[in-house]
Amino acid sequence: MGQPGNRSVFLLAPNGSHAPDQDGTQERNDAWVVGMGIVMSLIVLAIVFGNVLVITAIARFERLQTVTNYFITSLACADLVMGLAVVPFGASHILMKMWTFGNFWCEFWTSIDVLCVTASIETLCVIAVDRYFAITSPFKYQSLLTKNKARVVILMVWIVSGLTSFLPIQMHWYRATHQEAINCYAKETCCDFFTNQAYAIASSIVSFYLPLVVMVFVYSRVFQVAQRQLQKIDKSEGRFHAQNLSQVEQDGRSGHGHRRASKFCLKEHKALKTLGIIMGTFTLCWLPFFIVNIVHVIQDNLIPKEVYILLNWVGYVNSAFNPLIYCRSPDFRIAFQELLCLRRSSLKAYGNGYSNNSNSRTDYAGEHSGGPLGQEKDSEVLCEDPPGTENLANRQGTVPNDSIDSQGQNGSTNDSLL
């Protein structure tokens, strides 16, 4: 977000930065600018590199092109725009102690900032709803939320985010009326974000607090359902091991199906944990800023500007965290290694999206229609329908199977955040 407009102090600047005629002070100021410039450049590099890697991996490997990962792509796009169009200009504003890009770009830059944060949390909210349906209505899920429907949802998220961010700022509904704010609006080198109280509170509620409440509520429900499913798995495992060995030998496929069902559900729960970490990290990074944002307009001089800007940058840094969190997923981890040439590439055999061996074993070897979850008639099915319900021999362009197999990740689900 833009800088608050109460004072002209800059983030962590040395005390004597306004006395450049003193040699010692000038040297300290130069050292501060260089040091902060390096740190901010590394932040920008991490945001851009990490999210380009995520988007490229999902675009290149069809194995990663699941409905949930479509939403992850949207989240990565928001983070990438943050790294390209927001953070560098924010860094320039701090390091140069003035705005050098004019009034139009000041408001446009601020609008993009609000857009990225709003799109991110609304996407996380959609992911929470997506996981809720995936784990509570597994057999309806694939028809309920197809890839085409996911694209429409993503488009709607960005349209709503764009309207709530650009419209109030470009129409000047956000502007305060006191003299200091009016002077700043008229000055080409001032980009302090003076806002009226109504806009600050309303935008914080619409762009952050409301989606946050929905996200927390839905995800808490998801974890409750997941916990019940884990308990069912434990009980079912106990019954399975208590069966007569001769009965298991008579129907070995049943035992294999049961183990696959349990493994599938456990992987689904690991995916939930990964998404929970993403949502939790976003909340921890941005919640302090939005609390201060409300307090600042209610009590103007209560929060030092340095604290406001520092918390704003903590939120910016969140855009670099998500690619690291995705590394919890073996599929993402292997895809990243392939793209970075950190492991032997098998992409040549899959260059056209197909294996050159139509009989080659996939990660879902042995999976057939009529998924194993259907065999557990005495327990409620709460996990997503396993990939055995599709003709998986015809899946195209996956992350190379020999790469997956070499890591011992056979039997992974069709949700790549595992």
Curated annotation (Swiss-Prot):
Q: How is it modified after translation?
A: Palmitoylated; may reduce accessibility of Ser-345 and Ser-346 by anchoring Cys-341 to the plasma membrane. Agonist stimulation promotes depalmitoylation and further allows Ser-345 and Ser-346 phosphorylation.
Question: Phosphoserine occurs at which residues?
Answer: 246, 262, 345-346, 355
Transmembrane segment boundaries: 35-58, 72-95, 107-129, 151-174, 197-220, 275-298, 306-329
> How does this chain sit within the bilayer?
Multi-pass membrane protein
| Annotated GO MF terms | adenylate cyclase binding; amyloid-beta binding; beta2-adrenergic receptor activity; norepinephrine binding; potassium channel regulator activity; protein homodimerization activity; protein-containing complex binding
Q: Which ranges sit in the Extracellular compartment?
A: 1-34, 96-106, 175-196, 299-305
Places the protein is found: Cell membrane; Early endosome; Golgi apparatus
Instruction: Please give the GO cellular component terms listed in this UniProt entry.
Output: apical plasma membrane; ciliary basal body; early endosome; Golgi apparatus; intercellular bridge; mitotic spindle; neuronal dense core vesicle; nucleus
One Pfam family named in its UniProt record: 7tm_1
Membrane-side (Cytoplasmic) residue stretches: 59-71, 130-150, 221-274, 330-418
**Lipid addition sites, S-palmitoyl cysteine:** 265, 341
Key words of the record: Cell membrane, Disulfide bond, Endosome, G-protein coupled receptor, Glycoprotein, Golgi apparatus, Hydroxylation, Lipoprotein, Membrane, Palmitate, Phosphoprotein, Receptor, Transducer, Transmembrane, Transmembrane helix, Ubl conjugation
Query: Which ranges belong to the motif PDZ-binding?
Result: 415-418
Kindly list the cysteine pairs connected by disulfide bridges: 106-191, 184-190
Q: What residues bear 4-hydroxyproline in this entry?
A: 387, 400
> Region Disordered: which residues?
358-418
Keyword Transcription carried by entry: no
Going by the entry's taxonomy, the superkingdom of the source organism is recorded as Eukaryota
Please give the biological process terms from Gene Ontology that the record holds.
Answer: adenylate cyclase-activating adrenergic receptor signaling pathway; AMPA selective glutamate receptor signaling pathway; bone resorption; brown fat cell differentiation; cellular response to amyloid-beta; diet induced thermogenesis; heat generation; negative regulation of G protein-coupled receptor signaling pathway
Q: Where is the composition biased (Polar residues)?
A: 391-418
- Glycosylated residues? 6, 15
Q: What does this protein do?
A: Beta-adrenergic receptors mediate the catecholamine-induced activation of adenylate cyclase through the action of G proteins. The beta-2-adrenergic receptor binds epinephrine with an approximately 30-fold greater affinity than it does norepinephrine.
Could you give the subunit structure recorded for this chain? Binds NHERF1 and GPRASP1. Interacts with ARRB1 and ARRB2. Interacts with SRC. Interacts with USP20 and USP33. Interacts with VHL; the interaction, which is increased on hydroxylation of ADRB2, ubiquitinates ADRB2 leading to its degradation. Interacts with EGLN3; the interaction hydroxylates ADRB2 facilitating VHL-E3 ligase-mediated ubiquitination. Interacts (via PDZ-binding motif) with SNX27 (via PDZ domain); the interaction is required when endocytosed to prevent degradation in lysosomes and promote recycling to the plasma membrane. Interacts with CNIH4. Interacts with ARRDC3.
Family (UniProt): Belongs to the G-protein coupled receptor 1 family. Adrenergic receptor subfamily. ADRB2 sub-subfamily.
This protein's name: Beta-2 adrenergic receptor
Organism of origin is Felis catus (Cat)
